[in-house]
Amino acid sequence: LRDARPSVWPLQKPHPPVWIAANGHGPVRRAARLGDVWFANPHAKLSTLEEQMGIYRGAVAEHGAGQPEDIVVSREVFVARTRAEALRLARPALEERFRVYATQGQDQQLPPGDRFDLPFEQLAEDRFILGSPDDCIEQIERYRRIGFNYFIMDYHWLDLDDATALESLRLFGREVAPALR
């Protein structure tokens, strides 16, 4: 790797930033109180995250801490030439992934109505970065507008073949990433 650097240096004063992941509203408040960075869950709809961003910023202010430099979100990402193609290629793997999440109860910490046992079209709405390059750019910009500025993007999932995942990643690198700089 040329010109690579770690995103977190091991020795920092007073310490490396403490990232605290949180799904529910209560844990988001706890992340504001105890951590340096809120790591927003990869499961919630954008509307839930927008509500939680307000909760987080309010709790940070209430505890007298300055607003954090970074606020982190993780999302499943799939880019194809068209939204229809992205849905067709990603759907089987995402449906299976969220079916497993539901059996593990991972949606039980989310607000009522934000659940995983929905038809795929409803599940995918505002939950994934999914579509054409232009679709994905617009979706990422929506996360930026509500305050997320550090993205962890999950491109490859069980049940998604390597070649399909790699082509999506290449398309992201060629057409989406340059537009976000």
Segments predicted by a language model, with ranges:
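Active-site-adjacent structural elements that line small-molecule/cofactor binding pockets in enzymes
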Residues: L1-R181
